[in-house]
A protein has these predicted regions:
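Helix-breaking motifs and short loop linkers at transmembrane-helix boundaries and internal kinks
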Residues: 33-35, 67, 85-94, 105, ...
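Glycine-rich segments within core transmembrane alpha-helices of 12-TM secondary carriers
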Residues: 125-143, 318-327
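12-transmembrane solute porter fold
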Residues: 2-18, 23-27, 34-48, 53, ...
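Helix-loop-helix hairpin linking two adjacent transmembrane segments in secondary transporters
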Residues: 130-172
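Paired small-residue
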Residues: 81-85, 93-102, 195, 277-285
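Transmembrane-helix exit segments and adjacent C-terminal regions of multi-pass membrane proteins
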Residues: 5, 365-447
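Cytoplasmic helix-loop-helix junction between adjacent transmembrane helices
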Residues: 100-134
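C-terminal membrane-cytosol helix-exit motif in multi-pass small-molecule transporters
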Residues: 162-183, 434-443
Length: 447
């Protein structure tokens, strides 16, 4: 058990930070299962990040005067219990409430695990383990959530977290760590925390909007979408060895990372077609940028600053408030762009149906079925397969109808890809703003 203590604490950190985006690929399934609206289901994602961002600093302040292992164990237990509650939720209101409690327990767990890892490994190794676990969790969240949703259900996302968290409770209690009694000697590091917030807002476009495009826009399964977005965590993990090999100055490393994220998001905005292959290179750029920036900025925000736990709280708050800001900026944009794309898409659909080599009666029947599907799926990229599946066509008409369905799907995929373009470009702009905070001259102070 003693050897497993450190890894269990690191896994807990990764689980909590993965939860900021782990449900992204499951949102369509949650939408259908709980019979709710798009606006409400978005709060499954927003509520967790908002609560975690708001409570991280106050909890860190209180934590500085508390017994780390006791409060860590309580936080991990609350996180485990609320994860089970999420899995059992039968309404959107209950799920959102459970996510809020999960974030509260997660904040306690995150702050506590930092102190416990430092007590176990020493300050340098402990902070490094905490930061690395957070980056891994952030990068792998959508990938893991998509695979679990495809293989089992959206509830499985929360079920699998429970045993890991339960095992981490005795692991937390096993570490002897005294409260950090350092005086409040340093102000929060504004620049790295601001850069973290802006990058988190920008990464929302890659970790949230991209998977939404793959599942809702291009109608791929959550499993295939998860495998596709696995490029981001793989590239992020590869960034650290590359940085150690090249050993660039910290400011250069972060600046390059911001530029890579911006470039990757521009690449996603300019996809030439709805082919998964075209997303790989932009995702690799985003992943490399993520790996070069988030852990470095987190370390800079905490470096030589006491009390350590409080400055860790500021980094947690910056990252998750940044996610909420990113969602608040980008969601209305791509929603409006989807609505603007509806009329041109409907006109293109009508033109394709009229030009199809089908009998007039079959064209009318298919057009009516398509009209019903478009009405029922208003406000989202429609799946038109059911309209063709229910059509009563003669065998000789089936090949032409199948070709028409393929043409319509291609038209809708092009429309969806264009509808997400502005949001990806805004995400790139946020990454460039983060770059400006890195390269802007530091104000000199005199002591």
């Amino acid at each position: 058990m003693r050897r497993a203590v450190g890894p269990l604490l690191a896994v807990t950190v990764a689980l909590v930070l993965a939860d900021s985006a782990v449900v992204t690929l499951a949102l369509p399934d949650i939408l259908r299962h709980l019979d709710t609206s798009v606006g409400q289901v978005a709060w499954v994602l927003i509520s967790f990040n908002l609560v975690l961002g708001l409570v991280a600093v106050p909890i860190a302040v209180v934590f500085g005067r508390a017994q780390p292992r006791f409060f860590s164990a309580v936080g991990i237990a609350v996180f485990a219990g609320s994860s089970a509650w999420c899995a059992l939720a039968q309404s959107i209101e209950v799920l959102i409430a459970a996510r809020c409690v999960q974030a509260l327990g997660g904040a306690l767990a995150l702050v506590g695990c930092l102190e416990l890892l430092v007590a176990k490994y020493g300050a340098r190794r402990g902070v490094a383990a905490w930061v690395t676990a957070g980056v891994v969790g952030t990068a792998t969240g959508p990938f893991a959530g998509g695979l679990l949703t495809q293989a089992f259900s959206w509830q499985a996302i929360f079920v699998v977290q429970v045993p890991f968290a339960v095992l981490a409770v005795p692991a937390a209690l096993a570490v002897r760590a005294a409260p950090e009694l350092s005086p409040d000697r340093h102000r929060p590091a504004v620049r790295p925390n601001l850069t973290l917030a802006l990058l988190s807002a920008a990464l929302t476009a890659a970790l949230f909007l991209l998977v939404l495009l793959l599942v809702e826009g291009w109608h791929h399964s959550p499993g295939l979408a998860a495998l596709t977005v696995s490029v981001v965590p793989v590239a992020a993990l590869g960034a650290r060895p590359l940085a150690r090999l090249l050993q660039p100055p910290a400011q250069v490393e972060v600046a390059v990372g911001c530029f890579l994220i911006a470039g990757g998001l521009v690449g996603l905005a300019l996809l030439p077609s709805a082919d998964l292959v075209w997303t790989i290179a932009p995702q690799a750029l985003v992943g490399l940028g993520l790996g070069l920036t988030v852990d470095r900025l987190t370390s800079q925000a905490m470096e030589m600053r006491l009390p350590r736990v409080r400055h860790a709280g500021w980094t947690i708050s910056a990252r998750h408030i940044g996610v909420v800001v990113g969602l608040a900026i980008l969601t209305p944009v791509f929603t409006a762009d989807l609505q603007d794309a509806e009329v041109p898409a409907q006109e293109a659909i009508a033109s394709l149906v009229l030009d199809a080599p089908l009998k007039p009666d079959d064209k009318i029947a298919i057009a009516q079925s398509l009209g019903r599907e478009l009405t029922q799926q208003q406000g989202q990229v429609p799946d038109l397969h059911r309209a063709f599946e229910t059509a009563d066509l003669a065998p000789e008409e089936r090949p032409a109808a199948a070709q028409l369905e393929r043409d319509l799907d291609e038209q809708l995929e092009r429309a969806a890809t264009r509808a997400f373009r502005d949001s990806f470009l805004i995400g790139a702009g946020l990454a460039l703003l983060a770059l400006l905070t890195v390269v802007a001259p530091h104000r000199k102070t005199t002591s």
